[in-house]
Amino acid sequence: MPKNRQIRSIKLKEGKTNLTRISDLFFQIRLWGLDAQKRLRAARVLVAGMRGLGNEVTKNLVLAGVNSMTILDHENMTKEDCVSSFLAPTDHVGKNRAQASLERLKQRNPMVEVTADPDNLETKEEGFFKNFDVVIVTNYPKDVCLKVNKICRANNIK
């Protein structure tokens, strides 16, 4: 960094001081506009299924700056998961996929509230989904996806 350039630290709402986060926010506003960034920042997202696609989706949404992210998966990490699961350390084989992915996902953007749910999506009642604005389901059977889709459509959840 050039010597003549000063960087001022700005205190953010969450108490973090990090110019990079502010720079990222300004970039995102320029990228898709203030209204879209406000909607993203307010979004409560559920991603069910923490394999390759689920990992990529959660990473991108957390980096974009959603309000909160819940990752749900009832299965445990396998050696095969280590190939596509960049969020879960390889020494977490045998641990729940959602819980194994939690720490690295939180590190991607400390301003996003990230939680892990080790339950089975198939056991969730309709009221559970009402806690979210966006629900994304990956790696589940078609009948489960259709059931979740029906619940989300009935409750105006994206």
List each language-model region with its residue ranges:
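Adenine nucleotide-associated cytosolic modules
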Residues: 1-158
